[in-house]
A protein has these predicted regions:
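Amphipathic alpha-helical packing segments from all-alpha helical-bundle domains
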Residues: 93-117, 122-139, 151-154, 158-162
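Short, hydrophobic secondary-structure boundary micro-motifs
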Residues: 12, 86-89, 150, 171-173
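Hydrophobic alpha-helical connector segments
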Residues: 40, 54-83, 130, 153
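Helix-turn-helix
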Residues: 6-36, 40
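Short, structured helix-loop boundary elements
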Residues: 13, 35, 39, 64, ...
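Short linear capping/connector segments at secondary-structure termini
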Residues: 54-55, 87-94
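Alpha-helical DNA-contacting segments of helix-turn-helix folds
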Residues: 3-4, 31, 38-49, 88, ...
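Short glycine/proline-centered loop/turn elements that form peptide/ligand docking sites
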Residues: 7-12, 34, 112-123, 166, ...
């Protein structure tokens, strides 16, 4: 991940081999091909995103502030490592990234719904939908930078929260 962050999203296996001082044949002892190596990078990035957003969500108090904290942690991660984020997006075969992050959002939303005594059946659909929304907005923000990260967090939270809160009066009161 460090090599991609330092050298950019267009990095190839030769670049990774040189930068990490590991001969290319050694990579192929562990990975069958370049795609498998890139998939592992995507998984590592997704696991980092999950860890960072989990820490931020756990530190927040109310459900709404947890939503904002999760969005902010996601945006902070891509802001600090834009080339790594672009690398993951550039390689469309890295579906695991979206799945790992989407399942994490599903778990968080499902927990909120169950705590409020609500049916959590919509959690997966909402989790993946919210991840897609935030990811699309993040892509645009990363390219345009027409507003601060805090403003993006506020706008996205304002857009998403009424849908989540409307599902439960207990959440809405938080």
């Amino acid at each position: 991940m460090t090599v991609v962050s330092e050298q950019g999203a267009g990095i190839g296996i030769d670049d990774i081999s040189r930068a990490s001082h590991i001969a290319k044949p050694i990579f192929y002892r562990y990975f069958t091909d370049k795609a498998e190596l890139f998939i592992e990078v995507g998984r590592a990035v997704a696991e980092t995103v999950v860890a960072e957003t989990t820490a931020a969500i756990d530190a927040a108090q109310s459900p709404r502030s947890k939503l904002a904290a999760g969005i902010d942690a996601y945006l902070a991660g891509i802001e600090s490592r834009p080339d790594l984020y672009r690398f993951v997006l550039q390689h469309r075969d890295l579906d695991d990234y979206a799945t790992i992050v989407g399942l994490h959002a599903t778990a968080v939303i499902g927990e909120f719904m169950r705590e409020a005594g609500q049916d959590s059946g919509a959690a997966e659909l909402w989790g993946f939908g919210i991840v897609g929304l935030v990811r699309a907005a993040a892509d645009r923000w990363l390219e345009q930078r027409t507003m601060s990260r805090a403003a993006v967090v506020d706008y996205l939270t304002d857009l998403i929260w009424p849908g989540l809160a409307g599902r439960s009066r207990a959440l809405d009161a938080s």
